[in-house]
UniProtKB/Swiss-Prot annotation:
Protein name: Uncharacterized protein MJ0573
Species annotation: Methanocaldococcus jannaschii (strain ATCC 43067 / DSM 2661 / JAL-1 / JCM 10045 / NBRC 100440)
InterPro entries: KH_dom-like_a/b, OsmC/Ohr_fam, OsmC/Ohrsf
Family label: Belongs to the OsmC/Ohr family.
Pfam families: OsmC
Length: 189
């Protein structure tokens, strides 16, 4: 079956009638079975496109959570539904509230640093990752560690670049709102 034929079938009246019945069962099965075979660089874009489609179709654009059971909640991020396990019940196979917190923080720092470098006419690749040190006994995050990876082509003063990256990271509203210790590491590649 060629791609043109599949696209033609997708636009047919039969597909429009069958899709609401089949898609809820077929899409998860197809993703489970075939996602691993999509090349990694294409997989990232594919997943991002799916999420963008889901979010763009949601009317409410709200962020909310619904308690399900011990350590489990159904999260709604602008139409994207996520089964989440958190706290002492967190498992790597599920996205935890802590994962979403860190993703938001890393995204915010990444954008703040990227905009700062761009405003200073520095073209760079920026990636940010993070982890937390938490205490269930104290019921809080004790420390957040953020690693800011910066790759710049060309000759630039490394100390000046590090200083600029750290200055840019201070423009992140999320990190400015956190009361625990935040360690920011700049890694020049």
């Amino acid at each position: 079956m060629n791609p043109e034929m599949i696209m033609e079938m997708m636009n047919s009246d039969i597909a429009k009638e069958m899709a609401p019945k089949m898609m809820p069962k077929m899409m998860p099965l197809a993703l489970e079975k075939f996602l691993q075979y999509i090349p990694e660089n294409e997989r990232k874009e594919f997943i991002a496109r799916i999420v963008d489609i889901i979010v763009s179709k949601d009317e409410n654009k709200e962020v909310s959570a619904e308690y399900l059971d011990m350590f489990e909640a159904l999260l709604n991020v602008k139409g994207l539904k996520i089964h989440s396990r958190g706290g002492k019940g967190a498992i790597k196979e599920k996205i935890s509230p802590m994962d979403l917190f860190l993703a938001g923080l890393c995204g915010c720092v990444c954008i703040a640093v990227g905009n700062t470098l761009k405003a200073n006419n520095i073209d760079a690749e920026i990636k940010v990752d993070g982890k937390v040190e938490k205490s269930f006994e104290e019921g809080k995050i004790k420390k957040v560690i953020i690693n800011i990876y910066v790759k710049v082509d060309g000759d630039i003063d490394k100390e000046k670049l590090k200083k600029l990256v750290l200055e840019g990271s201070k423009k992140c509203l999320i990190s400015n709102s956190i009361s625990c210790e935040i360690e920011k590491n700049v890694i020049l590649e």
